[in-house]
Design a protein with these regions (language model features):
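N-terminal, polar/charged subdomain of small-to-medium soluble alpha/beta proteins
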Residues: 1-114, 120-132, 136-162
Length: 162
């Protein structure tokens, strides 16, 4: 978890637009993400934030034409450092956002969240931009691999080239 950088005002006090950006929280966990999302909203929102975008990457029952029975995510031992750096890179590039991102590892049932990202900003365009950037970069740059159990009994690894 990172804290608010010194000298930045995220409160929007006195009607001012928030300046700077901050990563409120990042993690890799075996815990279910759904209960964490409500607390995350309270962490990222301030009175200056007029938009909150939430992305939940949900485990689905199919992938590239194959029926999926279940899956499990594995992560590199340094995945927590990677996700923190990736989310910080978005905060460094986009002014006035507050970010929260957690990826789940271990077995995850169909219909449950594997990745949750929250991005708050004064305006919706910036919040959408930040949320999409975090989700895309986490998938592309954080060393997490998915083992899918297909309904035909075979298994398939996804993201192993990360």
């Amino acid at each position: 978890m990172t804290t608010k950088p010194q000298g930045l005002d995220h409160s929007g006090a006195h009607g001012a637009e928030p300046t700077g950006s901050v990563v409120m929280f990042t993690d890799i966990t075996e815990e279910a993400l759904e209960p964490l999302a409500n607390a995350a909203k309270a962490q990222v929102m301030t009175e200056a934030m007029g938009a909150l975008v939430v992305f939940d990457g949900i485990v689905r029952n199919h992938d590239h034409g194959s029926a999926v029975r279940g899956l499990s995510y594995s992560a590199h031992t340094q995945a927590k450092e990677y996700i923190a750096r990736v989310v910080q890179s978005v905060a460094d590039e986009l002014e006035g956002v507050r970010l929260w991102a957690v990826h789940r590892v271990g077995p995850i049932a169909i219909g449950e969240s594997a990745l949750t990202v929250l991005a708050a900003a004064a305006h919706r365009g910036r919040a959408f931009e930040a949320c999409e950037a975090v989700a895309d970069r986490v998938k592309a740059q954080v060393p997490i691999w998915k083992e899918q159990e297909l309904t035909d009994g075979s298994t398939e690894w996804v993201g192993i080239d990360t």
